[in-house]
Amino acid sequence: MRTNPLTTVRNLGILAHVDAGKTTVTERILYLTGTTHKRGEVHDGTTVTDFDPQERDRGITIFAAAVSCAWAGHRINLIDTPGHVDFADEVERSLRVLDGAVAVFDAVAGVEPQSESVWRQADRHGVPRIAFVNKMDRAGADLDAAVASIRERLHPVPLVVQLPIGTEDGFTGVVDLPRMRALVWADGADAAEEGPVPGTLREEAARRRRVLEEAVAERHPGALEEFCDRETLTAATLTGALRDLTRTGDGVVVLCGSAYRNRGVEPLLDAVVAYLPSPLDVPPVRGTHDGAERERPADPAAPMAALAFKVNATPTGRLTYLRVYSGTIGKGDTVWDAGTRRTERIGRILRVRADRHDPLERAVAGDIVAVVGLKTARAGSTLCAPGAPLLLEPPGVAEPVVHVAVEARRSTETDRLAAALARLTEEDPSLALRTDPETAQTVLSGMGELHLEVAVERVRREYGLEVTVGRPGVAYRETVGEGVTGFVHRHVKQDGGAGQFAHIVLDVEPWEQDADGDGAGGGFVFRSTVVGGRVPQEYVRAVEAGCRDALAEGPLGGHPVTGLRVTLTDGRTHVKDSSDTAFRTAGRFGLRDALRASGMILLEPVVEVTVTVPEDGVGGVLGDLAARRGRVTGSDPRGGAVVVTATVPLAELFGYATRLRSRTQGRGTFTARPTGYAQAPAAVVR
């Protein structure tokens, strides 16, 4: 059983834009907690959490890695998540099982595009956060500017609890504002030396503590009462109020440091323990059974319920990562998969330390562990006690937007390639496989060019297969331009047996989701305005099913159709020959023909790119973006460089990283994030 009480457990993720220092923060946490005995470095390829060869080669996090460590009597289950937009689904699956998060920001760049994306993902899941402004030792580092960008672009209430001591390369420590004590790190030291606030900073520290007190009192009734009585807050009251505001999402505690130089990570760990919630501090997990909503408390004695959020299908077996929400799960237990409605048997239970594992006899509510022995569980599967079924909501999976054709170089290895790709899609639900009906090629789809590069490289490295990869393509969509009214379709079939008869009249019109949807091309709505029972309800449902069948391939290029509303306005039946099958067929072919008359529009995926380039390279970058049909939306000077933002069709970005390096002599970088779909020009349609 657990040695830590549930109140001392923290399940948290490290979130950030790529290169903000997430993995370095994680490595310092592991080192300071005694989990590792050497500081892992991203640039040396010696990190614990980025243990995959590609992660070490590329210097970025690709796969969410779970680690467990201890600090100040607390068990911390930590997940280091990817920062690149192509792996946003890894972040989504991780956030689904976390109780809190540390958002890491670059002290020079502040909020970056993927910072916004992961922050909003955390908002959707209601995950409380604290912020860590990293790289305070860099030239141009500015805590106040970083906090301002957090406030302006992410819209939380930042509650800054530290004052930096020194600037840029002279950054040596912080003033802890709640306790009004200085923490200073000597070069190479693992621990800080604590002392009084330096005389040169006392006035500024007092002013900032006053600002912090006022911000907290304004939002916390208990703190307000003490502040009105005493005109100040004790350290205990301030800490307690900060904890409450963090857990309710009414404030975000902000700390700062330099993880690379080991400065500021100890206070960050203290803040994780002090401010982020335990499994008991978050609402009980909710699920459904037989259509009724049920709750499960974070109680080891309650019926067991767990969610699988990650699968590693290694050549030696499957590792399934679980968040246990309630109850206890033991080695050898039989569990119920609520999705497949099958029983599975738990083999080994492992405490995870990235690529190393410690065996456990059991796991209890609040634990994040890996188990061996599950054969059918996937990311998003609910496992529960057989006698107390419960289905938890799985993490969402985004639709792939880029695809490549993949073939084995040797025809004798086609079956091995199919098995390898199937194993990859088993691990990563954001990858999809299909066979092109015209070419019979295997097509692998994913979230971006890098996502697919990583998948193909895994096939080569892990399975020893030589593969040929086609040019990337994007996932186009088709939508309705003008629409059509009163379109009549009649389905009649007489072949000697039972006849088929269905007569329908359809209106087809463009439709967009609300503001919180994805705008143009935002889905499909079906309705019926038939009166007088001219088409029975069961046939109406069949027409809707047929219409949904027709959406799979549009008339422009066989792309999925979206962004339309179809209304069944009239119809006729035959006393003998009408059936569900007849009306479903009429719906499918009727809508297919109606779309041909509806002035269809081709939609292409569009991304927002953020290019950081030296000032002398801006002209070339702007010209290149224009040639790629890009629309520049902003250009901001930043510390000797210029940050250019633009919206660009995804299809035009293939190979852009190489082109940018060439134009800027290797000094330019860019990131991209999906923003939806937009109408493609006539040249693309042709």
Swiss-Prot record:
A molecular function (GO) held by this record is:
GTPase activity
Q: Where in the cell is it found?
A: Cytoplasm
- Outline the extent of the tr-type G domain: 7-280
Q: Which residues bind GTP?
A: 16-23, 80-84, 134-137
Q: Which UniProt keywords apply?
A: Cytoplasm, Elongation factor, GTP-binding, Nucleotide-binding, Protein biosynthesis
Would you tell me the protein name for this molecule?
Answer: Elongation factor G 2
**GO biological-process terms attached to the record:** ribosome disassembly
One Pfam annotation, family name?
EFG_III
Gene assigned in the entry:
fusB
According to the UniProt entry, the coiled-coil residues are none
Q: Which family does it belong to?
A: Belongs to the TRAFAC class translation factor GTPase superfamily. Classic translation factor GTPase family. EF-G/EF-2 subfamily.
Q: Does the keyword Nucleotide-binding apply?
A: yes
Superkingdom, natural source: Bacteria
GO CC list: cytoplasm
Name the major location.
cytoplasm
Query: What does the UniProt record say this protein does?
Result: Catalyzes the GTP-dependent ribosomal translocation step during translation elongation. During this step, the ribosome changes from the pre-translocational (PRE) to the post-translocational (POST) state as the newly formed A-site-bound peptidyl-tRNA and P-site-bound deacylated tRNA move to the P and E sites, respectively. Catalyzes the coordinated movement of the two tRNA molecules, the mRNA and conformational changes in the ribosome.
